[in-house]
């Protein structure tokens, strides 16, 4: 029986244990099928959002192990990659959407683009995120469920955060004097 090129779920199921052995999680898999030019792109990251991202040496070592694992699976008839493929292991880039709590924690202090504009992540606790709405005179803060703003993307910033915003980053959640996110409306802070 000829097996088809594996899909994302099959690859993730096959690779999860190996990637976890390196202390990493699979954040995403992208498959591009194009005959001999097919590509598999796997984004991995640390499970601990406060830990350093994997460096190039770790990615290179993991890439060798993943390649060997996939070659062995193909030789055993468990998967078929056809005419060949290119394997790319990477970490999530700045365009990677913030979906999980750990994504938000990793980016505390950074600007994010939301449906309603750009805000800064001040703090994350449980299911809530405190966002700073930039304002030259007096930035405002709001507390929302991060699930309500899932899909935000980090905004590249070329300068330091204004002092008024930087002072609000990383405070204990109750220091903001905000009600719980479930008590607030879903509308963004007023300008």
Curated annotation (Swiss-Prot):
One Pfam match: RimP_N
GO biological process terms held by the UniProt record: ribosomal small subunit assembly; translation
One GO cellular component term noted in the UniProt record for this chain: cytosol
Keyword Cytoplasm: yes
UniProtKB keywords: Cytoplasm, Ribosome biogenesis
Cellular localization per UniProt: Cytoplasm
Disulfide bridge partners, by residue number: none
PANTHER family: RIBOSOME MATURATION FACTOR RIMP
Family assignment from sequence similarity: Belongs to the RimP family.
NCBIfam families tied to this protein: PRK00092.2-2 (NF000930)
Role this protein plays: Required for maturation of 30S ribosomal subunits.
Protein name: Ribosome maturation factor RimP
């Amino acid at each position: 029986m000829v097996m088809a090129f594996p899909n994302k779920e099959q690859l993730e199921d096959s690779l999860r244990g190996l990637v976890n052995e390196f202390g990493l999680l699979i954040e995403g898999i992208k498959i591009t099928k194009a005959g001999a030019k097919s590509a598999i792109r796997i984004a991995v990251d640390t499970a601990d959002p406060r830990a350093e991202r994997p460096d190039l040496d770790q990615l290179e070592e993991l890439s060798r192990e993943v390649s060997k694992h996939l070659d062995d699976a193909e030789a055993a008839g468990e998967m078929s990659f056809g005419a060949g493929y290119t394997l790319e292991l990477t970490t999530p880039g700045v365009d990677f959407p913030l979906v999980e709590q750990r994504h938000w924690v990793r980016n505390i202090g950074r600007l994010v683009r939301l449906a309603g504009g750009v805000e800064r992540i001040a703090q994350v606790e449980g299911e809530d995120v405190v966002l700073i709405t930039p304002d030259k005179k007096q930035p405002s803060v709001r507390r929302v469920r991060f699930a309500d703003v899932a899909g935000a993307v980090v905004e590249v910033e070329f300068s330091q955060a204004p002092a008024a915003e930087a002072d609000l980053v990383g405070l204990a959640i109750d220091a903001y004097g905000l009600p719980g996110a479930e008590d607030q409306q879903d509308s963004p802070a007023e300008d």
